[in-house]
């Protein structure tokens, strides 16, 4: 379902559908049905999508499969989605403060928003759980993964991958990069995280083992000598 403001022009709608079709083609997906509505109820495009897929039962990964003493891997870099949105919506303001190349690079972060490539590699490797990091950021994902599995975790904050563009833009707007929308980054629990990281890096996907699960209840974040709890 696509709801568009009454200020939208037909070329914009055509471009939107073209982008959607091209993306689906890359991912070997199809758009089955849709509804488009022009209304003065919304001020910017509002899109709702329901995706349906299937997989072999033996390949199903759920949070309940996470066990103590597993590695926690984060792919690509956190904050990609929020960074690219801010760079596009506040481009003029940001370019008064930062070099144009930094903002232009941040605008292009939307090229990393699909997690299909790493999910395919993770399934082939054999993992316990995969979690797309969205609203609530990486801190929210840590909490959701640990609470859903009933395990504790300990994470090294300094190992969490983040781009300098995200750091600069978040500092400018006074937002926490660990709590912003991070679509494009995936959190994975696996027995041999370092081997999975090696496979991901071979495929050109940055990934880091940031911590481990444990049998306790605490969700611990370490930053050098400092310790905090989620």
Which residue stretches match the model-derived regions?
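Helix-biased detector of long, well-ordered alpha-helical tracts
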Residues: 1-230
């Amino acid at each position: 379902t696509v709801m568009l403001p009454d200020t939208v022009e037909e070329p914009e709608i055509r471009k939107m559908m073209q982008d959607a079709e091209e993306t689906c083609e890359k991912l070997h997906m199809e758009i089955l049905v849709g509804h488009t509505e022009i209304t003065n109820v919304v001020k910017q495009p509002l899109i709702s999508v329901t995706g349906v897929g299937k997989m072999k039962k033996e390949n199903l990964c759920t949070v309940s499969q996470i066990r103590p003493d597993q590695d926690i891997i984060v792919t690509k870099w956190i904050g990609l989605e929020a960074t690219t949105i801010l760079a596009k919506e506040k481009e003029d303001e940001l370019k008064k403060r930062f070099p144009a190349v930094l903002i232009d690079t941040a605008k292009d972060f939307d090229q990393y928003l699909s997690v299909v490539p790493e999910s395919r590699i993770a399934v082939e490797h054999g993992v316990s759980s995969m979690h797309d990091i969205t609203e609530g950021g990486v801190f929210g994902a840590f909490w959701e993964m640990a609470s859903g599995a009933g395990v504790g975790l300990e994470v090294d904050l300094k190992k969490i991958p983040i781009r300098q563009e995200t750091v600069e833009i978040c500092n400018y707007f006074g937002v926490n990069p660990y709590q912003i929308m991070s679509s494009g980054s995936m959190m994975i629990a696996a027995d041999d995280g370092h081997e999975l990281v090696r496979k991901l890096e071979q495929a050109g996907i940055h990934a880091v083992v940031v911590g481990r699960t444990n049998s306790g209840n605490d969700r611990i974040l370490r930053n050098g000598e400092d310790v905090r709890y989620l």
